[in-house]
Amino acid sequence: MGKDVKKVHKLRHDPLSKQIEESESAYQKPHKRVGKLRKKKAEMENDTGIDETESVIPSALSKKILDQIREQAIEVEVEDRKKEKQEKLLTFEQERIQSKLLSFNDFIDDDDDDEDADQDDNKRRSNGNDFDENDGFEQFSDTESQFGVGGEVEIDEEDERVLSMFMGGGGGDGQEQQFQTRFTLGDIIESKLKEHESRQVSSENAINPKVIDVYTKVGKLLETYTSGKIPRAFRILPNFTNWEDLLYLTRPDKWTPHSIRVATKLFCMSTNSKITQRFLSIVVLPRVRDNIAEYKKLNYHLYMALKKSLYRPAAFYKAILLPLAESGDCTLLEAKIIGSVVCKVSIPVLHSSVALMKLSQLTRYNGATSMFIRMLCDKKYALPYRVIDGLVDHFVMFDEEVRELPVLWHRALLSFVQRYKTDITKDQKEKLKIILRKHNHHIITAEIRRELFFSNSRGGVAPSNFTDDTSSMME
């Protein structure tokens, strides 16, 4: 059964008092229409008292206000400090700024991380855009050359005997005499330090003693360095105008091979080609030659330093390869090791073309010259005709040579003919024919003759039934 609903009795009319007030006879006060702004203004003027509850700020709001004030104060203080620092940098002398940067307590920089000495080079190659565009290394790759290695160079005793006639003024023991007179990296640095000490006494632009102390300590660290970070003072070394004097203070002749590798990477990536060339010339090349002379092989990290130096191919050719060929005392082992770096790394054709041109213009013959020419020819570059003409003139130059030429010379000529036989003119082939008559090898000369005279020439075609007079010499 459902619940009973109570009936609510509503009033049939308003109370009597309300009816009297609303009656027409009652007095009504006229209503004034006041705007909201005027009404609020009137209330504020009439409010003479102060409500104590409205004067108290809540704790949360007060905390927020204080935090904002504190942040604004910190920002103002930071801006003031920046302005003061800029003013100090403008007013302080350059020597004082330099001593501050070279503070020994700030040697290790936590911002930049250097890779370990044995880390792969792929990450470094990905930053190719940081290099100079003139070096042509935007597509550089630290992998095996796409042109092929060119084969292993064999060195026999007979070849060494013949080559010794072209070294040391024509004597049989010229190679040993050259090793006795060649200065090591330590000897060079000792002489440079003595010159620096003599200039330090009389020169007005002497190096700050604090800077000398810093880089002396840097050299001590590099004597035991194997991997990890390098001192910050050494990383900013290439930025100074007198970087070479500061470099000698670190004694590069006592560095570990790991230090040589890291320093080569630093100079190749953070400096221009001219500074890189100077560093390779005074540090890397003497150190590589000393290591080969002592151990009859090259340390792995020094070999990797040579590969790193090819980030700057122009600097590599000017500081390492060409000076070796021009020196006249480059051993076959040195040429073989350094030439293998050229074979394994892809190098822009323009730099290699200039190097071949310079090698072909050398008047003093050395076995290293033939080895370098052979290795560069085996890379199968599309050489300009001017370079090919220069190489032809290089081999024709030996027409007046009365001494027996080594096998390396014949192999270099064979490699050149195999790669560029169609780019040689008919007149140039006739000149080479005369050379083949005078300087003959019982195996290689026949192969050169077959490649040279049974192929197309530049501007013409060789006869199919061509016979050469040098065939009688092979019998």
Curated annotation (Swiss-Prot):
GO terms for molecular function: snoRNA binding. Residues 1-57, 106-149 are annotated as: Disordered. One of its GO terms (biological process) is rRNA processing. Pfam families: Bystin (PF05291). InterPro entries: Bystin. Residues 1-12, 29-41 have a biased composition (Basic residues). Keywords: Nucleus, Ribosome biogenesis. The keyword Metal-binding does not apply. Residues 45-54, 107-119 have a biased composition (Acidic residues). It comes from the Eukaryota. The keyword Nucleus applies. GO terms for cellular component: cytoplasm; nucleolus; preribosome, small subunit precursor. Its main location: nucleus. It is found in: Nucleus, Nucleolus. Belongs to the bystin family. Required for processing of 20S pre-rRNA precursor and biogenesis of 40S ribosomal subunits. PANTHER family: BYSTIN. This is Bystin. It comes from Dictyostelium discoideum (Social amoeba). The gene is bysl.
